[in-house]
Amino acid sequence: MMRSHYCGVLNRTHVGEQVTLSGWVHRVRNLGRFIFMQIRDREGIVQVFFDEKDEALFKQASALRAEACVQIKGEVIARDTSQINKEMATGEIEVLVKELVVYNNSEVLPLDFNQNNTEEQRLKYRYLDLRRPEMAERLKTRAKITSFVRRYMDDNGFLDIETPMLTKATPEGARDYLVPSRVHKGKFYALPQSPQLFKQLLMMSGFDRYYQIAKCFRDEDLRADRQPEFTQIDVETTFMTAPEVRAMMEKMIRGLWLDRLNVDLGEFPQMTFAEAMRRYGSDKPDLRNPLELVDVADILKDVEFKVFSGPANDPEGRVAVIRVPNGAEITRKQIDEYTQFVGNYGAKGLAWAKVNDVNAGLEGLQSPIAKFLTDDVVKALLARVNAQNGDIIFFGADSEKVVTDAMGALRLKVGRDLGLTDLTAWKPLWVVDFPMFEKDDEGNWSAMHHPFTAPKDLSPEELVQNPKGAVANAYDMVINGYEVGGGSVRIFDPKMQQTVFGILGINEEEQKEKFGFLLDALKFGTPPHAGLAFGLDRLTMLITGTENIRDVIAFPKTTAAACLMTDAPSFGNPKALAELAIQTTVEKES
């Protein structure tokens, strides 16, 4: 027998037992008469010790380095009260070693387990980084999340059905990863950005409730919460309304938080996209932060200060403020830093006013823009934001997009900087009623979610007449400022689907080429269907309390979409490329 117990499960109930443990040497202390070691495995750490009375065993133990892989056999002993380590789950006991087997000693480590290593080091030696208890715990949590999801789905009649990994390139927003075909030279498969069309086809096939823990691929610029390959909890249903889908998925997430964190999230509030953008400057608002954007264009439209009155009178403009309680303590240096910060979002500056005496109107303000304001304007402004003595008010005035983006980002930053954001809280919500379409950089319509999302209460003819005003029957689940899931009711009428494609600039020939199979399927008794997908990586990131998605993926890529451990991607073998009829335009570096 190579193991009788996991290291991390031993406790006082095992005192007197003979145990066999296998794992890694976590830490060594040689005190002369005794050698104390911490032995670690997947489930935790336990202290073992060697007595110098057994000379051969003591000598063998003396040669061990950290991260040596060993087996020990010994007796579980209760520690003296003074020696109990309350920081360790196994801190009430230790193991007197009687036999030692060294499976493999370790060379000097390229990582220091007790120090902060660079992310580059951690990714290059990922197999060592994953031995760290906090990393092991995160991946164990991930496994328990997927186990919970599978149980919930099974209990609610969902079928786990796999969809193809080699599929057809379709416009879903990001670039595809292409896979060349050897048999069909010059042609390429695409790795799926999501199982979207296949899960819709499964609903058309009558499977009613589908789910899949699905690997997805997107060739896009990466951020801290993005990876080129990621995992979705993918869900689709027939004959369920959007509120019914949301209720079922909300119940799952509430159950998951209760299971993993013993936290009751309560019933999720619901907010429209328009309200979220107006009040928080984001379609994924972090409700732990009490600060809000307040529109004041109507108050400032007649002031002589063109920086305010210009956008206030522009139909495409916006003037909004953020009141920061007790923000008068913010220094001029901090204000300058915030001014530079909002510049990253296109803002040309950041006006501000400190409220020294709310009852004194204009005279009670300390602000470089006070000279441009009247007493009546100031009083109306202070009343609108419910200002108090000691507050600071930040102003944003520009195009609607610039103000919304800049002030939304400033809200988050100030909330963090001043400790206003309650980092211990959980604040979930549903964001609903998204615009159906948005303009891209070239002024053309693009789908805000994807081209298969149904509009709310519109005929194809009405949609064509007013695409700008169309509201999608779409919904996102947001927790603490992270979009953890999103979905919609799908189009199940072929005419509506063709209409949406047309608005997006996809002509009939292109529709037939790229989506002919879908348009054909829609003709044969397609049922109403809806669904959504959760980001498993992002859910795990939230539940484990890390802010880097790479911490919850076993073998992640860098922000340059590279694997430092395996050196992927790499140049293709010339013979293999020739078989695929591929010639590269980039020369391999010598």
Curated annotation (Swiss-Prot):
Cellular compartments annotated: Cytoplasm
Major site of localization recorded for this protein: cytoplasm
Entry superkingdom: Bacteria
Oligomeric and partner information: Homodimer.
E.C. number: 6.1.1.12
GO terms for MF: aspartate-tRNA ligase activity; ATP binding; nucleic acid binding
Protein's UniProt keywords contain Ligase: yes
UniProt binding sites for L-aspartate: 172, 218, 449, 490
Protein name, as recorded: Aspartate--tRNA ligase
Family according to the record: Belongs to the class-II aminoacyl-tRNA synthetase family. Type 1 subfamily.
InterPro entries in UniProt: Aa-tRNA-synt_II, aa-tRNA-synth_II, aa-tRNA-synth_II/BPL/LPL, Asp-tRNA-ligase_1, Asp-tRNA-ligase_1_N, Asp/Asn-tRNA-synth_IIb, AspRS_core, GAD-like_sf
Catalysed reaction, written as an equation: tRNA(Asp) + L-aspartate + ATP = L-aspartyl-tRNA(Asp) + AMP + diphosphate
